[in-house]
From Swiss-Prot:
Name of the protein: tRNA dimethylallyltransferase
Species whose genome carries this gene: Aquifex aeolicus (strain VF5)
Function according to Swiss-Prot or TrEMBL: Catalyzes the transfer of a dimethylallyl group onto the adenine at position 37 in tRNAs that read codons beginning with uridine, leading to the formation of N6-(dimethylallyl)adenosine (i(6)A).
Residues covered by region (Interaction with substrate tRNA): 33-36
Gene this chain is encoded by: miaA
Transmembrane domains' residue ranges: none
């Protein structure tokens, strides 16, 4: 049985479609979202809370905010879940926009060195004194391939890549096998026109604020998670920290969140477009029609294995 992978940019409609597909295929969903792994962060990560009542979901609420979780850990945990789901006679459906996680699962990551906390803390201290850009430029010089794949403010990933290079002399990208897939899978890429997607992103940010995102950010700050919330990774959270602290207006924070989410979507689109997966245009099909099409593609692929 092949696994089904449904990917695409943020706010495209992955969760709604995956929920429909999972019910029709008797599947279970494995989330490939680098923010959904964190507990207490429901609104800003758009966790599919309604669908979670109907379909079993995995790799959501795994660690506390700021807890260590990377693509290698995701690969190992996702593989375990895939085997567990298959043993039940159900279809494993991987859903998300974090392409580094999807890439790790499908193509594998060689064993990377264990964390060196002393070195890591020194690198964080350098970033505190000299800024994220300073470390990002260092990473670009030693590992341009990996630097291209991550955001210049994603300090956690920058520090990890530098840490590995300093300890091994090898670029972090050399631990990734990006040639032949190690898993038998059917890939579905969801797309929309830029105008349509950007409108959905704008609406989603406003909806999240309406649903209580600012209150969620305030609660997380009270719990002591400010360092994580202001990291480059925490899109739709970091933008609202100044607002929660009374340093910016709500409208300013909303505009910043929309701008950063659109940038993230562009990076995701660039990666998914290159994969050669089956493309589903959600501007032309309703969720129900797209669901039927994905089910057909998946069943046909399993007939010809």
């Amino acid at each position: 049985m092949k696994i089904l992978v449904i990917g695409g940019p943020t706010a495209i409609g992955k969760s709604d479609l995956a929920c429909c597909v999972a019910q029709k295929l008797n599947g279970e969903i494995i989330s490939a979202d680098s923010m959904a792994v964190y507990k207490f962060m429901d609104i800003g990560t758009a966790k599919p809370l309604e669908c979670m009542k109907k379909v079993p979901h995995h790799l959501i609420d795994v660690v506390e905010p700021g807890g260590y979780f990377d693509a290698k850990i995701f690969e190992e945990m996702a593989k375990e879940k895939i085997e567990e789901i298959k043993r039940k006679g159900k279809v494993p459906i991987v859903v998300g926009g974090t392409y580094l996680y999807i890439q790790a699962l499908l193509y594998g990551i060689d064993e990377t060195p264990k964390p060196d906390w002393n070195l890591r803390n020194k690198l964080y201290e350098i970033a505190r004194k000299k800024g994220n850009d300073y470390l990002y430029e260092k990473l670009k010089a030693i590992d341009p391939k990996y630097a291209k794949k991550i955001h210049k403010n994603d300090l956690r990933r920058i520090v990890r890549a530098l840490e590995v290079f300093i300890n091994t002399g090898k670029p972090f990208s050399s631990f990734h096998s990006w040639n032949k897939p190690k898993m038998d899978f059917v890939g579905i890429y969801l797309k929309r026109s830029p105008e349509s997607l950007y409108k959905r992103i704008e609406n989603r940010v406003y909806d999240m604020v309406k649903d209580g995102l600012l209150e969620e950010v305030k609660k997380l700050l009270e719990m002591g998670y400010e360092n994580f919330l202001t990291s480059g990774q925490a899109i739709d959270y970091k933008e609202f920290v100044p607002c929660a602290k009374g340093e910016k207006s709500l409208e300013e924070c909303i505009k910043e969140a929309i701008k950063n989410t659109k940038k993230q979507a562009k990076r995701q689109i660039r990666w998914f477009r290159k994969q050669g997966w089956h493309e589903i245009d959600l501007d032309k099909l309703s969720i129900e029609e797209a669901c039927e099409e994905v089910v057909r593609i998946y069943k046909d692929a399993n007939k010809t294995k």
